[in-house]
């Protein structure tokens, strides 16, 4: 990756488990969730910190009930955990997509990510995190 040049490689990782809301009263569980995200990110990312505007996509795949988690409460702990591991500062996150996907429903998986396919085969809750270059404005839905 060439930091600051727009030429970094797309980053992705899988975080096993159910996300903990940023609004959780159980601060220890929230801290543990952020640590899980950091560990997964460190295992998948060996490049220098990204120092340019980025696109962050967080997809929560779950079985059964999603726990009533709001998208913004899923996003915040993940974004906080990636800061200082993948990207320098969260102000670099210019575009965000958060998706909740119930594994009990039939759906087409719009990905060629081997990591996602392998995680789906386990039929357990997980979060797929992607950090990528900003798309051209006209290319974004």
Language model: regions and residue ranges:
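Acidic, proline/glycine-enriched N-terminal capping motif
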Residues: 1-141
């Amino acid at each position: 990756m060439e930091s600051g040049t727009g030429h970094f490689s797309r980053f992705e990782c899988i975080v096993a488990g159910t996300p903990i809301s940023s609004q959780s009263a159980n601060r220890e569980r929230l801290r543990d969730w952020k640590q899980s995200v950091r560990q997964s990110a460190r295992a998948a990312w060996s490049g220098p910190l990204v120092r340019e505007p980025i696109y962050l996509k967080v997809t929560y795949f779950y079985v059964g009930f999603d726990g009533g988690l709001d998208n913004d409460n899923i996003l915040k702990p993940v974004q906080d955990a990636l800061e200082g591991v993948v990207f320098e500062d969260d102000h670099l996150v210019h575009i965000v997509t958060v998706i909740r996907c119930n594994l009990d429903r039939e759906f087409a998986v719009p990905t060629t990510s081997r990591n996602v396919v392998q995680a789906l085969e386990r039929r357990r809750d997980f979060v797929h995190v992607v950090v990528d270059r900003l798309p051209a404005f006209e290319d974004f839905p």
